[in-house]
């Protein structure tokens, strides 16, 4: 009798060790996909920054049509960044959830929502990061295999409603966090092009000496919706950064602007 109990105990222990190893491998593979997504975000942010500068330059030069094209491309890029950030954050939540798998009895409550989430993420990033989508498909198969091996999934298995609810909640949380993150990382898009850029351009062209007026800065600020890039102003108005800061300080002293950060 004791020999039989010992065999059962050893069998369960081996299954737990195997489960732990398999979960760890999946978590590491998911981390690799997070690294890929992080690199994709970095590249898109660089492109966003380049286009943002082109929008400002085009508006100042009075090329409204070109500025509009650049602004639309920025909008598309930011939609992609949001999708990728959502995937990144959702994967992080999946990894944390996998870490909670300790006992064989609780496997199904973790693996079912994980499979739902990975399947949804695969479809979301397919057109943006196809290599990540392929990897997620493979990882989903691995999770499915674990579910079958542990008995959590079979032909007679009924997927509890709570699994779908957990998956939905995790995705919604990731989307909200991604929206906040994108707003924090990227400057607000310039206001719709107006006649202001043309006036700024005329002021620059009519200035024969390297000087920067308060009106120029105010018009620039109105054009960008409050965003100030000192390096850009210094370069495009052909003045020093100190002169830019001096004008900004004068405007702040007059109560015309408020400098933050």
UniProtKB/Swiss-Prot annotation:
Specify where the region named Winged-helix-like fold lies, as residue ranges.
Answer: 213-261
Q: Which GO terms describe its cellular component?
A: cytoplasm; nucleoid
SUPFAM superfamilies referenced in this protein's UniProt entry, alphabetically? Winged helix' DNA-binding domain
**Gene3D superfamilies, alphabetized:** 6.10.140.1230, Winged helix-like DNA-binding domain superfamily/Winged helix DNA-binding domain
> Where does this one sit in the cell?
Cytoplasm, Nucleoid
User: Which Gene Ontology BP annotations are present?
Assistant: cell division
- Protein induction: Induced around the genome segregation and cell division stages. Down-regulated after UV irradiation, indicating division inhibition in response to DNA damage. Expression is highest in dividing cells.
Keywords, alphabetical: Cell cycle, Cell division, Cytoplasm
User: Is Cytoplasm one of the keywords UniProt gives this record?
Assistant: yes
InterPro entries in the record, alphabetically? Cell_Div_Complex_Comp, WH-like_DNA-bd_sf, WH_DNA-bd_sf
Domain observations: The winged-helix-like (wH-like) C-terminal extension is necessary and sufficient for interaction with CdvA.
Q: Self-association or partners: how does it assemble?
A: Interacts with CdvA. Interacts with CdvC.
Q: Report the function annotation for this chain.
A: Part of a cell division machinery. The CdvA, CdvB and CdvC proteins polymerize between segregating nucleoids and persist throughout cell division, forming a successively smaller structure during constriction.
- Protein name in UniProt: Cell division protein B
Species for this entry: Sulfolobus acidocaldarius (strain ATCC 33909 / DSM 639 / JCM 8929 / NBRC 15157 / NCIMB 11770)
